[in-house]
Design a protein with these regions (language model features):
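Acidic active-site catalytic centers that drive phospho-/nucleotidyl reactions
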Residues: 50-51, 78
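N-terminal cap/recognition module
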Residues: 68-89
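Active-site acidic/histidine clusters and adjacent loop/turn architecture
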Residues: 120-123
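Short coil/turn segments at secondary-structure boundaries
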Residues: 113-118
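Domain-length cofactor-binding catalytic modules of enzymes
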Residues: 2-34, 41-48, 54-62, 68-72, ...
Length: 307
């Protein structure tokens, strides 16, 4: 532990990660060490958040600079899982009626809408149809998923700030669409690494490609293809949350005073950082971090820490 900087280091074969925490979760540390021992991230700057914990495919609270290789399972199946936040002001809400509306009108769990939402822009619809066809999916079913909550830790709630303002907060992602994209490209990654392993003459290079189905990586044209599909999934998730918010606000007969989204499971193609259970916090960037049902969420602005 480096007391002054409040982090400890986890080393692997190719890289060393900084973990900004005073506590060691050994299961999560093993996952971090495995990441640092994967050639996909040998040139990345890896930083782990204070609330890190074990995850499926990767440790949660993971950030790394995007280099030439990518493991689809790092971001995982719920591409662009994140938060939509709308400030409503000091309004009165009938929570019983709102609860009834949400339960009856916003599909949750494995359910989706009966019809495709007319709110979906035509250009995004075309992109979703294109990716669906490539993956052998029914495009209509994927489109019907837009405007649905999903399951797990996804939620819709009304929060109240200390000043009395109420906020509509929605936590959801890319539904089955993101899952299918991840699974397709992770399979591609395994096949690619197997091929490269067989072709490699150099022993060290052979070791880099000697990976299993869950931690194989993509590079070159295959990585670019994954990024292209991922960008569509990220649009899907943003739109999914936005449409749910619009429907709820229409029911409440309210207009949002301000709205924004905070994503915590995605690749940011502007700052080229992979985030898994972590958010962007550039200087003055508005962010929302969900805590739990007791404490609600944190509204904050980024400090732009370069580390």
């Amino acid at each position: 532990m480096t007391a002054q900087n409040n982090y400890f280091l986890v080393e692997g074969k190719y890289n060393t990660a900084r973990v900004f925490s005073q506590k060691r979760d050994e299961t999560a540390v093993e996952q971090i060490a495995a990441i640092c021992s994967n050639a996909a991230y040998k040139n990345s700057q890896i930083r782990i958040m204070p609330d890190y914990h074990p995850g499926l495919g990767s440790v949660i609270g993971f950030t790394a600079t995007l280099e030439n290789r990518i493991i689809p399972n790092t971001v995982g199946v719920d591409i662009n899982c994140g938060m939509h936040c709308s400030r409503l002001g000091k309004v009165e809400i009938n929570f019983r009626l709102l609860d009834q509306f949400i339960r009856s009108s916003i599909p949750h769990g494995f359910k989706h809408n009966q019809k495709i939402s007319p709110r979906i822009p035509s250009d995004i619809k075309e992109e979703i149809v294109r990716v669906s066809k490539k993956l052998g999916l029914g495009a209509d079913n994927q489109l019907k998923g837009i405007g649905s909550l999903g399951g797990g830790n996804h939620f819709i709630e009304i929060n109240q700030a200390e000043n009395g303002d109420k906020y509509l907060v929605i936590h959801s992602g890319s539904r089955n669409f993101g899952l299918q994209i991840c699974n397709y490209h992770q399979k591609q990654a395994y096949q690619y690494c197997r091929q490269q392993y067989k072709k490699a003459a150099d022993l060290e290079l052979k070791v880099e490609y000697d990976l299993n189905k869950s931690n194989s990586f993509l590079e070159g044209k295959l990585a670019a293809e994954y990024y292209q599909d991922m960008k569509v999934a990220q649009k899907y998730a943003d739109l999914n949350r936005k449409i749910m918010a619009e429907r709820i606000l229409e029911f409440l007969e309210l207009e949002a005073l301000a709205s924004f989204q905070t994503r915590h499971n995605y690749i940011n193609f502007e700052d080229h950082i992979i985030r898994k259970g972590a958010v962007s916090a550039h200087q003055d960037e508005k962010i929302l971090i969900p805590l739990n049902m007791r404490d609600g969420s944190i509204l904050a602005r980024g400090l732009g820490n370069p580390d």
